Amino acid sequence: MRDTKTHGTASSRVTRLVVSVHDVASATAGQTRRWCADADSLGIPVSLLVIPGPWRGAALADEPGYAEVLRARAARGDELVLHGWTHRAGPEGSPPRRLLGRLVARGAAEFAALDEAQAADRLARGRAVLAELGLSVRGFTPPGWLASAATDRALARAGFHYTTSHFGVLDLRSGRMRRGFALSHRPGGTGERLGAATMERWARWNAGRGGLIRVALHPDDLARPGLRDATLRAIEAVLAAGGRAVTYSDVVPDTAGSR
């Protein structure tokens, strides 16, 4: 298993860096492989956010060979995280809530307006598929980082350890929030270049300040010129300042309150 990596000089306030690879599915195997290769070249672990249901093609259960790839990544020290079921928003919720999902998550806000029973059903289906393929998860990241309060209750009842939002990582057992804004791109959207520059500046500014920095990698980022390079510069800046690369499970310890 790969150790987490720290660069630069030691500090009493070490910044922790979580790099997450989103939208992991057989349909995005090539993009995931490329992001993982970048992480491997830096010697850092990643949190792989897996979509088990049908999305952009076959469901994970129909591609058991790809599950072997994920098992190999986990054996290297990466973490697998449940990332919704189908990654598509339904008709649930009020018009303002659905509009928010379209604007923020581009129609992927699957859990933004679910009630507890609906959320529990999708969580159970997703985890059952992963378990059948020999894959285990402790945490959940909702598509678009948008989830209803009922989803959080369903997660806690199902025994998940943590969930994430745009603003941090929530320990579902203690209720404690580890603050850390998720830095990500919006490929093809308004302000794409400004957003890329902001990611790099934010990472550099906060690299030596302690706390938590989160960098989110998406498959569609790789189709846009400059986004990959900006992302890698942001990650390298945190590592050069002494940041420690970890997975989400490292942020939320087994014993609540021990960190």
Each predicted region: which residue ranges?
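Catalytic domains of cell-wall/extracellular-matrix polysaccharide-remodeling enzymes
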Residues: F111-L183, A223-D229
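Acidic-and-aromatic substrate-binding clefts and catalytic sites of carbohydrate-active enzymes
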Residues: D23-Q31, P52-Y66, R88, T141-A150, ...
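Active-site beta->alpha N-cap acidic-glycine motif
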Residues: R2-E79, E132
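Hydrophobic faces of well-ordered beta-strands that scaffold small-molecule active sites
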Residues: L17-V21, V46-L48, L80-H83, V137-F140, ...
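A conserved mid-domain beta-alpha-beta active-site/ligand-binding segment of alpha/beta enzyme cores
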Residues: G180-L222
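Active-site gating loops and adjacent loop-to-helix segments of metal-dependent hydrolytic enzymes
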Residues: G93-E116
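C-terminal domain-boundary segment and adjacent tail
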Residues: R2, S11, V46-V50, L212, ...
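Short, solvent-exposed beta-strand-terminating loops
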Residues: E79-R97
